[in-house]
């Protein structure tokens, strides 16, 4: 919980306060508390997002293998704590993105971790447009 700025006591109190809204699940020997608004089961097909550096999806967990195979750790973050912007596709980190200057403006450049990764170009374009809209471009 260190990344949240909360103490362990405060985090436990928060879980207690909204406990009736949480579902407890056991997975791979760990207890997970899920809020109904954050559930993704059945809804991540085709879902793509450009996540910023230091996003809590990677920063918030010691074991990141559920969303990122360990062989790609060095592409998402360094040993000394530098995190890179990543592409989340269908619940998995599949690549990096960065802001590149183009003749017709700014747009993110993408690099997938595995050549065989297939992402529908229309989905990738939509994610890029959402990013540009967020920047006000």
Predicted regions and their residues:
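Long, charged, low-complexity, helical-prone intrinsically disordered regions
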Residues: 1-137
């Amino acid at each position: 919980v260190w990344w949240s700025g909360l103490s362990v006591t405060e985090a436990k109190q928060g879980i207690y306060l909204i406990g009736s809204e949480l579902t407890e699940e056991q997975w791979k020997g760990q207890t997970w508390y899920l809020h109904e608004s954050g559930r993704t089961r059945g809804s991540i097909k085709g879902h793509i997002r450009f996540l910023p550096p230091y996003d809590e999806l990677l920063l918030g967990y010691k074991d990141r293998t559920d969303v990122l195979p360990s062989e790609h750790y060095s592409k998402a973050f360094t040993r000394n704590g530098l995190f890179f912007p990543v592409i989340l596709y269908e619940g998995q980190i599949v690549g990096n993105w960065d802001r590149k200057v183009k003749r017709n403006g700014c747009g993110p450049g993408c690099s997938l971790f595995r050549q065989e990764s297939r992402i529908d170009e229309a989905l990738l374009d939509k994610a890029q447009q959402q990013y540009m809209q967020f920047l006000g471009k």
